Amino acid sequence: VLLVEDNQLNAEIAAELLRMSGLTVDCAWDGIEAVDCLATCPDGYYDMVFMDIQMPRMNGYDATRAIRSSARDYCKRVPIVAMTANAFAEDVKKSLDAGMNAHLSKPVDLNALEQTLQRFRYEPSAEQPQ
C-alpha cells in the first residue's frame, strides 16, 4: 500500500498498523509525491492508498482529484482511503466527493482499519496484474 502522510510520527504509527495487518508499506510525504508515485508505478503496484488530508504543497483532496483525473485506468480504480483527523460528516462527504473510496478518522481504530482492508482487499481494482 501507499501511505501518504506528512507527519513522521503519524506515518510511523500508521505504517506499523498496516504492517501488523500483513501489508508492505511505501510512504509519500505529501500529495505531490503521492501523485508522482501513482503516475510512475506499474499498474497494480499499490493495492490501496491511505491519504492524509492536511499536507503541505498539495492536500489529500487535490492529490486524489489529480490521481483520479490521470489518463491511467489504474489511477481511476485504485482504492483511496482518507486517513485524517477531520472526522465530521462534512469531512467524510468532502473526501468521497474528491474521489476517495472510504474515510478513516485518526486516531485509527484497528478494527475499523481491518474492516476497510477487507472491504477493498479482494475487489478486482485492487488485484495485482498477472
Where are these regions (language model features)?
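C-terminal compact regulatory domains
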Residues: 1-130
